[in-house]
Structures are given as structure tokens and as C-alpha cells.
């Protein structure tokens, strides 16, 4: 006999499952819920969003002359979402200074592409010295940066959950650090 979990018995389960699958693949931008868009249209929208973010928003925010190192960092962080941040390793990988990596990470945070999640320790002093994690805030954008079309790693799932908690906490103005 097959015993189903309670939530699967709910009449709304198929709709909830479809909504979850959509969210997992395309993220949370409202434009992507347009029912006239097919799957390919949504991927094109996400790719365009990432390009617009780089070409217009980042240039306006920090006046970068060369976007290549920034794009490399953005991709490296997307690959490492949900992981501890190692600034030195990222600097070596991208070919820039640690100071530049820290600036770029700050730009990603200010533009709501990522958040830094401090390690959790009861002792506030320890919390300051422990290595934080970095999380991408939108799974659809993450997928576009990595040129993926579905599928999710454990770290990507962790980032999806962390980003939702972060958004909900910010919505009610709770301190999320």
C-alpha cells in the first residue's frame, strides 16, 4: 500500500506543485508569471535581465570600465551560492585583489543580487570572526548567470530557502542578522 503525505491529499496540491516548480526554475520576478510566456520566453527574459543589470545598473552604480572581472565574480559566486566566502580564493580565481572582490561583493549586496549571512554563534564576538556565507537572492537569476535550465544543487536550494526567509523578515522589518 502507498501511504501519501498529508499535503499531497490537498486538492490544491497540483497547483502548489506547479507554482513551486516554476519558482524553483524561474525565480520570483512577477513578469515571469505571465501565462502568455512559454519556458523559452522566460529564459530569454532572465538572460536579458542579467545583461541589463550588468550593462546599465552596475555601470551606473560603480562606473566600472571593465565588466569582465565583475562578471567572473558574479559567476563564481553563483557557483558557490550557499557556501562560505573565501575572498582570497575568489581574488586568485578572478585575477583581482581581495579589496576589489570585497567591493564587488558589496555591489552585489547593494543591488539585491546577493546577501551575506553571518555565521550563527551565541557569542557576538565569535560571530564577527567566523566566515559568513553568501547567497544569491533569486534562483531564476542564478540559473541565468550559470546558463542552467532547471535542476538545483543542495546549496542552490539552501540559498532559495535563505532568500525567502530574508525577504519575509525584511517585509515585516525583522532583524535578519
Describe the role of every protein-language-model region.
Residues 33-177:
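Accessory nucleic acid-recognition modules appended to NTPase machines
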